Amino acid sequence: MNKKVAIESCPSYDPDLIYAALKRAVELAGDLDVAGKSVLLKPNIVFDAAPEKAICTHPAFLEAAIRLVREMGASRILVGDSPGLPPPGFAGKVSGLGEVTKRNNAQWVDFSREKMELNYPEGKAQKKFTVSRVLQEADVVISLPKLKTHQLMYFTGAMKNLFGLIPSVTKSTYHVRFPERESFASMLVDLNLAIRPAYAFMDAITGMEGPGPSGGDPRHVGLVLASSNLLAVDVAASIIIGYPPKELPVNKDALERGVWLSSFDEIEYPGLSPLEKQIPDYVKIIFKKSNWQLLEFILPRPLRKLRLSFAPKPKIDHSACIRCGDCLRICASKAMDIAETGGERRVIIDYRRCIRCFCCHEICPEKAIFVK
């Protein structure tokens, strides 16, 4: 397994600058073969949001990626993602990703159109996944994540981005099945091993800090990352924003598998080093180990639910809420409703049912749901 991660400076979303940075990064990291192959580019689209909000992979970044893989000989280029609540015929209009795809003669694909079962008998947490049938059309899968914090997983990068290959609300069933961070991380690692993505181009030109992956604030970082080793990309990115990589659940579980790396020290940086580009004041999700988290592996499963009484929970800012109902539709445990309270209709949460997956926080277009 290639252990090189190339980190290159890129000060803005000028398509030519991004293309040049991506090309240099791929040349340094090596190991990308797309000649004569069908390539699926998988950007990160939590929901269809404008580029300046830093919620989605930037359209100019996608444009540079399309240009690069085409010049490297790709025979067909597919682009798509499946947000949590995609409207019928979802086409990435607000984010600009659909228009860029069309303008560059790539093919926008609907992940929700058809599903298939993807078996992975060696799975530690999950041995079968329901994924988009688009996977069958791709010889090469390239993850195009956005560098962001994440309320549930602390950080989201190249590996977490592939969760979007599970169509729309089907993702909610995995949150119910794997409500703890550690078990959810194991499932994500199994998914990556089942899909076997070939490469990652990370959009770290403008990242998101604070309560990501959608409720945080844009933060200029000025970098692009590239490698065929998705774990190594995520380790490098987590160092850049100031996380100890071994403390992040996906990194930790993936390292234990020994497939991508046997030690974080094995990673080679032929370009910039993540430590020299580290941003000490990047606003992160605070990593805390409560006594309840430490007891999760000792207590019987029914008693583990007691920890939820002490865990952070989603709360509603009623002054910002527009009662669009997206949070109700995404809630896997059916813990949310709109009811008459105090003389007005409000979103309410039944914390006895809430599993603290924070999908409601992630999907809210008005930043009206926060975690406390």
Which role fits each region the language model picked out?
Residues 1-322, 328-332, 337-344, 351, ...:
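N-terminal and secondary-structure boundary signal
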